[in-house]
Amino acid sequence: MSNLQSIIEAAFERRAEITPKTVDAQTKAAIEEVIAGLDCGKYRVAEKIDGDWVTHQWLKKAVLLSFRINDNQLIDGAETKYYDKVALKFADYTEERFQQEGFRVVPSATVRKGAYIAKNTVLMPSYVNIGAFVDEGTMVDTWVTVGSCAQIGKNVHLSGGVGIGGVLEPLQANPTIIGDNCFIGARSEIVEGVIVEDGCVISMGVFIGQSTKIYDRETGEVHYGRVPAGSVVVSGSLPSKDGSHSLYCAVIVKKVDAKTLGKVGLNELLRTIEE
């Protein structure tokens, strides 16, 4: 365990005692170092190690502690003002820094300090919370919310109104993860630490949490908390055992590999689900 991690772990055990007035200099410096590291991509709350996603709980604890050490303060936002504990990521950015980091930010997009935005990303009017990681080439479309500590892969398209759940409210054990080369359809919600593996296509209006049945119609298998790589998923329902009613589920209607996904349009994939 690193010294930085040990400071965070110890502080978290006495978090109820920590306020902006009582926090000691060492703890405050450690928390601020973590937030700065998350902000620039040095740290990630979750990362893939040997093919499996691993959550670094101590980094998540540092994010939670950051709310304990700061008072609300006035935040300028061009035509308006805000009053919050967490600074905005781009508050001190210059044109040169935007050019250097290589992403686009459309007016009204909001990103909290402590979230990482990689190059070639486009942020339409959307919200990215503290601790989130948005990787290269991703489109974050209008009214998307990327929750605290959520992990978004490379070349992902988060369509209009998509919600990616966070870990802070309500408190979750693990962040929601969207793998590389995924398409998440408009108004869909992926929450509660669900993992959408690489190359998935999620249709419009699909809601997936840890208790959602994810039914593979080809195999009859039911998954929870994980959408297998290359899945094309739509909303559906499954009948109860006695046939008296049906309950919502997500249905894997087909699987596609990266080559097919690259050649075939998304609309074509979704319009041929009855084959």
UniProtKB/Swiss-Prot annotation:
Catalysed reactions listed for this entry: (S)-2,3,4,5-tetrahydrodipicolinate + succinyl-CoA + H2O = (S)-2-succinylamino-6-oxoheptanedioate + CoA
UniProt protein name: 2,3,4,5-tetrahydropyridine-2,6-dicarboxylate N-succinyltransferase
InterPro entries referenced in this protein's UniProt entry, alphabetically: DapD_Trfase_Hexpep_rpt_fam, Hexapep, Hexapep_transf_CS, THP_succinylTrfase_dom1, THP_succinylTrfase_N_sf, Trimer_LpxA-like_sf
GO cellular component, as recorded: cytoplasm
Species whose genome carries this gene: Mannheimia succiniciproducens (strain KCTC 0769BP / MBEL55E)
Quaternary structure and partners: Homotrimer.
Pathway recorded for this protein: Amino-acid biosynthesis; L-lysine biosynthesis via DAP pathway; LL-2,6-diaminopimelate from (S)-tetrahydrodipicolinate (succinylase route): step 1/3
KW Isomerase (keyword) present: no
Subcellular location, record wording: Cytoplasm
EC number: 2.3.1.117
GO MF annotation list: 2,3,4,5-tetrahydropyridine-2,6-dicarboxylate N-succinyltransferase activity; nucleotidyltransferase activity
Binding of substrate, residues: 104, 141
Gene3D superfamilies for this protein: Hexapeptide repeat proteins (2.160.10.10), Tetrahydrodipicolinate-N-succinyltransferase, N-terminal domain (1.10.166.10)
Family statement: Belongs to the transferase hexapeptide repeat family.
Enzyme class: transferase
